[in-house]
Amino acid sequence: MSISRIYTGGCQCGAVRYRVEGTLGDPHLCHCRMCQKAAGNYFLPLANAPRERFAITRGEPGWFRSSQIVRRGFCRDCGTPLFYDALAADHVNVTLGSLDDPDDVRPIAQAGVESRVVWFAQLARLPEHESNEGEGGEARHVRIRDTNRQHPDYDTDHWPPEGSV
């Protein structure tokens, strides 16, 4: 499965933004231990973008060589994992959570399943609650919302807005 259109994305603070024109291919969840560590999570959702249709439109990511053949791109300011770049490949992988609209790309496969946490299949059965129902309730949710410095899910001319930092 591949999807054809224009995708934009970036880090949480807005220092790094990117654009993909055309197809995002092979959307998947990678459970390998390297991706777990790189994401600080149980898996890393990725999809590949052809290099010639991929562009960094703002800032410059930091890069970490996780092996001789792979580097991982991230925001140096906020730490958001953004890219998995197998250097010899004709594409770069973007992290699906960094897309401006992550609902646009649904994973179709799982990789690195030998490292998948054993209780992964049980996640959908966990109790659920809205953001404002957690610790601190509505008051905490309002304080976070009103002081939010997260970049919006669309391109802006500059970020952050004047006087917000």
How would you describe each model-predicted region?
Residues 1-165:
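A short Gly-Trp-Pro
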